[in-house]
């Protein structure tokens, strides 16, 4: 039977341009992160439900649980498009997945570049976030544990200095403050005591009333912002490796989805050609 010049070569009925390897690799790739996203949302929702209503509303902007829920929901929606799109060979869902993942990757890249170029503004924003967290230190147990962990890990106290704790109503040094913690700092600011079996939670009592030299004998007096900046400078290669580790899965997801979309389009063209070929033997 003659074939019209320029028409595609004939393929068997069982032939498919869509590679099962690419299809199911993309599916299981998204399934893994889909499960992770559901766990993140579940943990975030559980953490929110365990808090008192007043505390939950007071520190909404600096609540780690909210961040966990938001990131989890966005990841869930994104990986849903990837999972269903690859399994059902749906071009629309796959292109949505690829586009969103590309936007996320570019936003991360832009944030890194802008953070490096406008480091002073980033420093000011970080200081604002830390001060806001200090204000709500006693309002949220998760936030309190996060701050305590950060101060102990980086051997620091407050944002700029230990006196930043006056921003908190319980640690404020004003004369009319009835709190027993007036002019104090949290125990996580205290220097570690060797062979101490029980943590002295009152070790920071009255530390804000002391000058820098006197306070430095008992607590960390350096602010956490400077410590954080120094830590970043000392661990640039490690942070670069982490950034690369985050970028590679995103680039792999973008690449696999684009390859699969191209294969699906070729398969659609083949099906259309076969239909026309059966309808017109001279095609």
From Swiss-Prot:
Belongs to the tetraspanin (TM4SF) family. Pfam families: Tetraspanin (PF00335). Residues 1-24, 86-96, 257-283 are cytoplasmic. PANTHER family: TETRASPANIN (PTHR19282), TETRASPANIN-33 (PTHR19282:SF154). Part of TspanC8 subgroup, composed of 6 members that interact with the transmembrane metalloprotease ADAM10. This interaction is required for ADAM10 exit from the endoplasmic reticulum and for enzymatic maturation and trafficking to the cell surface as well as substrate specificity. Different TspanC8/ADAM10 complexes have distinct substrates. Plays an important role in normal erythropoiesis. It has a role in the differentiation of erythroid progenitors. Negatively regulates ligand-induced Notch activity probably by regulating ADAM10 activity. GO terms for cellular component: adherens junction; cytoplasm; plasma membrane. Glycans are attached at residue 172. Keywords: Cell junction, Cell membrane, Cytoplasm, Disulfide bond, Glycoprotein, Membrane, Transmembrane, Transmembrane helix. Disulfide bonds join 156-224, 157-189, 173-183, 190-203. Residues 46-64, 118-235 are extracellular. Its main location: membrane. Homodimer; disulfide-linked. Interacts (via extracellular domain) with ADAM10 (via extracellular domain). Interacts (via cytoplasmic domain) with PLEKHA7 (via WW domains); the interaction is dependent on PDZD11 being bound to PLEKHA7 and facilitates the docking of ADAM10 to zonula adherens. The chain crosses the membrane at residues 25-45, 65-85, 97-117, 236-256. It is found in: Cell membrane; Cell junction, Adherens junction; Cytoplasm. This is Tetraspanin-33. It is a multi-pass membrane protein. GO terms for biological process: protein localization to plasma membrane; protein maturation. It comes from the Eukaryota.
């Amino acid at each position: 039977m003659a074939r019209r010049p320029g028409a595609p070569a004939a393929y068997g009925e069982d032939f498919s341009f869509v590679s099962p390897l690419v299809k199911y690799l993309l599916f299981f790739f998204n399934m893994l992160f889909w499960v992770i996203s559901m766990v993140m949302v579940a943990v975030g929702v559980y953490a929110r439900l365990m808090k008192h209503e007043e505390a939950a509303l007071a520190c909404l902007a600096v609540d780690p649980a909210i961040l966990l829920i938001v990131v989890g929901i966005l990841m869930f929606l994104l990986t849903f498009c990837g999972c269903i799109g690859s399994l059902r060979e749906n071009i629309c869902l796959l292109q949505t997945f690829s586009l969103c993942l590309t936007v996320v990757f570019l936003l991360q890249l832009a944030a890194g570049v802008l953070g490096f170029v406008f480091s002073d503004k980033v420093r000011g924003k970080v200081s604002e976030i830390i001060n806001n967290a200090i204000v709500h230190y006693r309002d949220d147990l998760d936030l309190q544990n996060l701050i305590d962990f950060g101060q102990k890990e980086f051997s620091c106290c407050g944002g700029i200095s230990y006196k930043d704790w006056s921003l908190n109503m319980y640690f404020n040094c004003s004369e009319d403050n009835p709190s027993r913690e007036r002019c104090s700092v949290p125990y996580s600011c205290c220097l570690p005591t060797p062979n101490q079996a029980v943590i002295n939670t009152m070790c920071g009592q009255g530390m804000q009333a002391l000058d820098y030299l006197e306070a430095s004998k008992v607590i960390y007096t350096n602010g956490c912002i400077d410590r954080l900046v120094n830590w970043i400078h000392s661990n640039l290669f490690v942070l670069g490796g982490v950034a690369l580790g985050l970028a590679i899965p995103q680039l792999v997801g973008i690449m696999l989805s684009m390859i699969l979309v191209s294969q699906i389009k070729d398969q659609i063209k083949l099906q259309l050609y076969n239909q026309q070929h059966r309808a017109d033997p001279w095609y």
